C-alpha cells in the first residue's frame, strides 16, 4: 500500500523522465539531465528561536560546544534588522512564515486570527498545495504557531504542540527531543519522502521578559539553546551518514530584547524600535554548499525565509512576496563575504542598525500599545478562568458549583470584551499601516476543488489506496509534457 502523496510524486516524476529524459522544472542554479534531484529526498529544517539577541549569542555561545557556532561554521550568517516593523512575536513569525511584512499580512499582536493566513498563505500551505508529497511538521511550545500551521486550506501534516512543563527550559528540551526523533525517523525512508520541519523554542523570550536581555538568566537561556541546537545538528549528521540525504538548515529569531528590566521581575522586553529589540539574524546552511561555510551575508532578512524554503523544494514563488530566495537571488548572492573574523564582523553589522525616523517610531509604538490591550485582557481572563477551574476541580459542596457559574460568566463576558477590544485594535492597526496592502496573486483554490471528487484533505492526510503499477499507466494522461516545457 502507498499513500496518495507518494503516488502523486512518483507518477509525476516518472512521467517527466519517460517523456523527456530530463528534469522538468529543476531549481534555478541546478543543472540536471535526469530527475535524480526529484527522486532523492530533500529535507529542510527551520529552527525558530524566540527573542534571541545575536549579540548575546556571540558573547555567550560562540564556542565549539554550541550549536550556534556549529551552524555558523557550516553555513552563512546574516545580521538582520526589523527596523520599521513591529517587534512582537505574532507579526514577526507571520512574516517569517508567509514571506511578507506586516503591512501586508496585517498581524498586529499575539492573539491568533485565521483571516490573515487565508489571504497570505503560509509556507505550510504553499508546500502542501504545490508539493503535497512533502511531509510537513511543526514542533512548537507556543500554541499560536501551531494554530498558524493549521490555518489555511492546506494545513501542516503533523502538528505537535508541546505543553509548557515545569519551566521554559524543560519545555524546550522536550521540543529538542521530539525534533531529534523526527529527524532520526527519516533514516528509515524507503520511499524517499522529502520533509519540512519547523522546530520552535521559547526559553530566551521568557528569560528576557522576566529578567531582561542583559541578565544572567538570559545568558543561561542562550547557552541552553546552543546545547539544544548542537544535539539537533548531531542527529542530522548521523542520519546523513547513513542515508546520504540532503539537509538544508535555517536558524532565525523573531526579535531581540531590551537589556534592562522595566520593573523588578518584569521587562517589557520588545515591541518597540530600539536596536536591541529590532535585532534579528538568519543562519542558512544550504545542502551541498560547502564553499560558503563560515561566510557572512550582508543582505539576509527574515522575510526571505519562506521564499528560500519554497525554492529548496522547487516550488515557484509568489509574485507578491516581499522576500526573495537566499538560494539564487543575485543581489543576495553578491552580498556574501568571507570576513577574517566572523564574530567581529557580525558585531560591526549589528552596530550599524539604529532607530527608524521619528514618525515611524511613534506610529509603531502606538500600534504596539493598542494591540497589546486585548492581548493582556485575554491573559487576565484566562488566569481568572484557570483559578476558578482549580476550585471546580476540588468538588467542594456548593462552592465548586458557584465557581463553575462564575467561570461561565467570566468566559462569556471576558471573551466578549477581548473580542470587541481586539476588533477595535485591529481597526486602529489598519489605520496605522498594518494589513493595508492586498495580495496581487490569486488565492489558493479550495481543497478538492479540481482534480479529485472526494476529499483531497483526507487523501493528503495519509489515507491509503492501492496504487496501480506505474509501468501500466498511460502517463500522457497524467500531465502534458509539451505544456510543461512551454
For the regions a protein language model found, what residue spans apply to each?
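Metal-dependent active-site segment of extracytoplasmic phospho-/sulfohydrolases and closely related
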Residues: 45-46, 63, 67, 224-268, ...
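Active-site rim elements
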Residues: 110-114, 216-219, 268-269, 289-300, ...
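Active-site His/acidic residue clusters
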Residues: 146-158, 179-231
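Composition-driven, intrinsically disordered low-complexity tracts enriched in small residues
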Residues: 1-42, 334-486
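Non-catalytic, well-ordered alpha-helical segments in soluble enzyme domains
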Residues: 54, 288-289, 297-327, 331
Amino acid at each position: 500500500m502507498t499513500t496518495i502523496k507518494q503516488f502523486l510524486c512518483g507518477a509525476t516524476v516518472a512521467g517527466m523522465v519517460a517523456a523527456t529524459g530530463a528534469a522538468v522544472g529543476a531549481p534555478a542554479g541546478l543543472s540536471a539531465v535526469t530527475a535524480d534531484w526529484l527522486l532523492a529526498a530533500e529535507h529542510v529544517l527551520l529552527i525558530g528561536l524566540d527573542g534571541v539577541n545575536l549579540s548575546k549569542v556571540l558573547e555567550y555561545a560562540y564556542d565549539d560546544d554550541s550549536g550556534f557556532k556549529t551552524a555558523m561554521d557550516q553555513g552563512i550568517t546574516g545580521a538582520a534588522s526589523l527596523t520599521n516593523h513591529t517587534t512582537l512575536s505574532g507579526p514577526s513569525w507571520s512574516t517569517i512564515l508567509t514571506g511578507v511584512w506586516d503591512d501586508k499580512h496585517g498581524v498586529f499582536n499575539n492573539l491568533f486570527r485565521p483571516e490573515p493566513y487565508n489571504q497570505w498563505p503560509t509556507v505550510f500551505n504553499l508546500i502542501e498545495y504545490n508539493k503535497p508529497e512533502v511531509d510537513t511538521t511543526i514542533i512548537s511550545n507556543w500554541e499560536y504557531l501551531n494554530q498558524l500551521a493549521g490555518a489555511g486550506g492546506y494545513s501542516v501534516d503533523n502538528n505537535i504542540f508541546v505543553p509548557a512543563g515545569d519551566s521554559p527550559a524543560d519545555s524546550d528540551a522536550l521540543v529538542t527531543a521530539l525534533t531529534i526523533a523526527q529527524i532520526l525517523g527519516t533514516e528509515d525512508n524507503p520511499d524517499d519522502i522529502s520533509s519540512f520541519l519547523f522546530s520552535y523554542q521559547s526559553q530566551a523570550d521568557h528569560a528576557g521578559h522576566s529578567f531582561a536581555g542583559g541578565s544572567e538568566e538570559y545568558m543561561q537561556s542562550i547557552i541552553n539553546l546552543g546545547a539544544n541546537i548542537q544535539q539537533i545538528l548531531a542527529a542530522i549528521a548521523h542520519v546523513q551518514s547513513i542515508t546520504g540525504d540532503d539537509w538544508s538548515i535555517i536558524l532565525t529569531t523573531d526579535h531581540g530584547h531590551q537589556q534592562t528590566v522595566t520593573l523588578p521581575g518584569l521587562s517589557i522586553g520588545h515591541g518597540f524600535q530600539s536596536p536591541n529589540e529590532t535585532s534579528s539574524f538568519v543562519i542558512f546552511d544550504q545542502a551541498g554548499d560547502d564553499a560558503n561555510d563560515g561566510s557572512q551575508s550582508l543582505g539576509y532578512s527574515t522575510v526571505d525565509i519562506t521564499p528560500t524554503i519554497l525554492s529548496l523544494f522547487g516550488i515557484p514563488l509568489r509574485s507578491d512576496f516581499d522576500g526573495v530566495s537566499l538560494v539564487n537571488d543575485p543581489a543576495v548572492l553578491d552580498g556574501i563575504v568571507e570576513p577574517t573574523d566572523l564574530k567581529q564582523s557580525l558585531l560591526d553589522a549589528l552596530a550599524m542598525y539604529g532607530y527608524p525616523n521619528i514618525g515611524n517610531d511613534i506610529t509603531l509604538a502606538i500600534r504596539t500599545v493598542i494591540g497589546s490591550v486585548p492581548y493582556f485582557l485575554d491573559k487576565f481572563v484566562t488566569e481568572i478562568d484557570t483559578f476558578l477551574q482549580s476550585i471546580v476541580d476540588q468538588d467542594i459542596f456548593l462552592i465548586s458549583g458557584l465557581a463553575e457559574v462564575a467561570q461561565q460568566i467570566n468566559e462569556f463576558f471576558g471573551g466578549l470584551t477581548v473580542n470587541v477590544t481586539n476588533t477595535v485594535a485591529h481597526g486602529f492597526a489598519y489605520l496605522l499601516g498594518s494589513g493595508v496592502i492586498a495580495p496581487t496573486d490569486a488565492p489558493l483554490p479550495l481543497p478538492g476543488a479540481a482534480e479529485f471528487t472526494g476529499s483531497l484533505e483526507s487523501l493528503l492526510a495519509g489515507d491509503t489506496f492501492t496504487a496501480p503499477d506505474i509501468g501500466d499507466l498511460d502517463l500522457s494522461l497524467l500531465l502534458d509534457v509539451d505544456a510543461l516545457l512551454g
